[in-house]
Swiss-Prot record:
GO cellular component: bacterial microcompartment
Its EC number(s): 2.3.1.222
Gene: pduL
Cofactor(s) the protein needs: Zn(2+)
Family statement: Belongs to the PduL family.
Keywords, sorted A to Z: Acyltransferase, Bacterial microcompartment, Metal-binding, Transferase, Zinc
Name listed for the protein in its UniProt record: Phosphate propanoyltransferase
Pfam families reported in the protein's UniProt record: PTAC (PF06130)
Amino acid sequence: MDHDLITKLTGQVIAQMRQRTIPLGISNRHVHLSAKDYQSLFPGQTLKIKKPLGQPGQFAAEQTVSLIGPRGQLKNVRILGPLRGQTQVEISYTDARQIGLTAPLRLSGDLTGSVSVTLKSEAGEINLTEGVIIARRHIHMSPLDAAIFGVTQGETVKVGIEGTDRKLIFDDVCIRVAEDMRLEMHIDTDEANAAGIDGGQAVARLLLTKR
């Protein structure tokens, strides 16, 4: 087959693949615990899987905690597994205002200088000196997905939300690339409500990269 024809056909296939939609995951408030903090809150207990999540190996656990801030508390906040090296609490702006916190907007794992909160279970209580964030909206991709979409780790893009009565465009969506990632965009409940997302019909579509 002619080389130029192969190049042309390959380009057409990639262009079509870039038009595919991206599944949406809505992140409610949740906690990732370190092994040490987990044992303080749930001594002698095994972290029990309630249901698997969209990313391979990740799951919602049966265990929950309360988050206690200066002006109130949020009860029954789900623990996500597996356990991590450092405890991280992810809430929305609405949640933060409700309990009197001024949490920074960060990517997962960027916890230096973030705010504190008290975590309480039936068996224990810990004061987390830092670790509370509002998660930046982002898209998980494998290296192959990133190559197909023409994006790189850490890049920000524009994404359109489709399949709702309130179509919306999100700017500054961060690309997160790793071998074990499955294609999925993550937004929080505030963002989902703004887009009128109710149920599983909504999807995301990559609109524009910002290099």
